[in-house]
């Protein structure tokens, strides 16, 4: 049984070779550093989290953003073929944390195309689109962006709130209440989903 599982995994990996495994490895390492820093920030209370995230922006996000700019200018948005599915997801996650509006905007079209080709999972796509809109002071579409206010997570302004779950379902996401439960567990903070904005 173990042998056949290993054989299947080896064959699957061979069927989808990455043409740039070094870039994939670099993206995964960058992602790991990013996530470790954010997990450390999640351990504090609301105010401590905000301070920690500001420090993370300086220490982690700015250098990562410089490298993402280099990658995008050299290769465009990386594909599954170039860096594998996990490499694409790592690039996307790092891009969401990048303090560079121009880069994020340039990547929107290729990310949307990759999502339609099923190279990007629904939650990663929703997070990207929503965060981009919120940073432009526009209502989000999928309800994935929350802010820390008064020591709790509050969903950012969301377009057409009553049809939110329909939009989420259309792209393969669970209802907003399920997502809120996961956020509460991860951040150990109360979660608020306003009925109206």
Predicted regions, residues:
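Sec-dependent signal peptide recognition
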Residues: 1-8
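Generic detector of ordered secondary-structure context
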Residues: 9, 60, 103, 159-160
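Hydrophobic h-region of N-terminal signal peptides that target proteins for export
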Residues: 9-17
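N-terminal helix-rich structural modules
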Residues: 19-137
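Mature-region segments of soluble proteins
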Residues: 89-91, 95, 104-188
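Intrinsically disordered, compositionally biased glycine-rich interaction modules
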Residues: 185-197
